[in-house]
């Protein structure tokens, strides 16, 4: 059986930090995974349900969902995923079955890691979502102007913004 999320946390949190807090930063999916668990604990709802009801629906996005682990479980309008060259196309299945699977179909427990990504939606859905959090006129934002400013503020070339890999005054935003 695959490790439980709690076991995953135990293993990851036992690893030493690469630097002291406040000295440097590094992008970490673990932070988003922890955030999804906090959302579930505080809201009393599964993460996907909470995000759909409280974030996506108010943004006008009604056809976004968390990806599944296997090709045969993908939604009708979901793309076919491919593994990047050099990433190793085949690996052992995430659930320790011993099966060798395509990395993008069974290599990871995607629903378990949902807070760190895995959201699927069309280009139109993604555009509606971004328009609802960008602070620009035309589409009502679902977050406060203060939150938009915190999320999109440019600090310096070595500092991540809140929720984005990078925000730049001229180049714009870069994905998480």
Where are each of the predicted segments found?
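Short, surface-exposed loop or secondary-structure junction motifs
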Residues: 1-175
């Amino acid at each position: 059986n695959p490790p439980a999320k709690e076991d995953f946390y135990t293993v990851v949190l036992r690893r030493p930090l690469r630097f002291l807090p406040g000295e440097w930063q590094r992008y970490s999916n673990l932070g988003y995974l922890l955030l999804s668990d906090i959302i579930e604990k505080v809201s009393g709802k599964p993460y996907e349900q909470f995000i759909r009801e409280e974030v996506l629906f108010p943004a006008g996005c009604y056809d976004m969902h968390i990806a599944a682990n296997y090709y045969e479980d993908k939604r009708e309008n979901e793309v076919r995923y491919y593994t990047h060259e050099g990433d190793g196309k085949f690996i052992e299945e995430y659930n320790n079955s011993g099966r060798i699977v395509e990395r993008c179909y069974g290599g990871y427990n995607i629903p378990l890691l949902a807070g760190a990504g895995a959201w699927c939606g069309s280009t139109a859905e993604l555009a509606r979502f971004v328009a609802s959090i960008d602070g620009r006129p035309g589409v009502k934002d679902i977050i406060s102007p203060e939150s938009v400013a915190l999320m999109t503020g440019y600090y310096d070339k070595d500092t991540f913004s809140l929720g984005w890999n990078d925000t730049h005054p001229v180049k714009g935003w870069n994905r998480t």
